[in-house]
Amino acid sequence: MVNLGQLLSPKRKAPRNPGSKWSRFRKNIFVSFVIDLLVIVGSALVLSLLIKTFLVRSFFVPSGSMLSTLQIDDRIIVNELVPNVVPIERGDVVVFKDPGGWLGTVSTTPQSPIQASVDWFLSAFGLTAPDSSQHLVKRVIGVGGDHIVCCSADGKLTINGKAITETYLDKGIKPSDVKFDVTVPQGSIWVMGDNRGNSEDSRFHGDLPSKGFVAKQFIVGRAVVISWPTAHWTWLDNFANVFKDVPKP
């Protein structure tokens, strides 16, 4: 039997759940946040890659050859515009690839795929420098055409006949215990570590094809600042006053 009351009374819609609208709103906010975050991180990564490729790069110092200017494991920021855009100068602290035989055989520790991925990601932001052990850090003593001799009667290096007082060396460190007389080829540099007694630099590679010189093609750039640890933070001076009176070759 049909219930007349049911026919005459209007159907009532089920009440809406007020919480569902709020849930959808929160979900949309979360999705929007995730998308924005991915865009920001992606943009930062691309920008960092561009900066790393064309402007600056981070390295760590693997040895004590530049003590006490640079400490072992210091992290340095390198200006990659030097020397291709900005000319290299005497006194610059430079990072360069092994010109051939300077480092010998460099052993590397195998990494798991996860470790390699994390290292790649961090290096893209300049937070790590996984290839630092394949590079060297030294100070430029001579540029193309310079005639460098060790040593003068008072034990100093001479460049183009002018003796220099190397104020970046720690007290008591001799300019060199090894005598040499070289002329730097055009397009190359002559480099030495500030820790002269513990630096396998240009002086010790004259028997190699490079003759101890570093060609421009191997130079990564000029180290401009110690960025880590914060206690060591400082701009790296090229001590222009040391070389200001050196005549042109």
What is each model feature region?
Residues 1-249:
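Extended hydrophobic leader/signal-anchor segments used for secretion and membrane insertion
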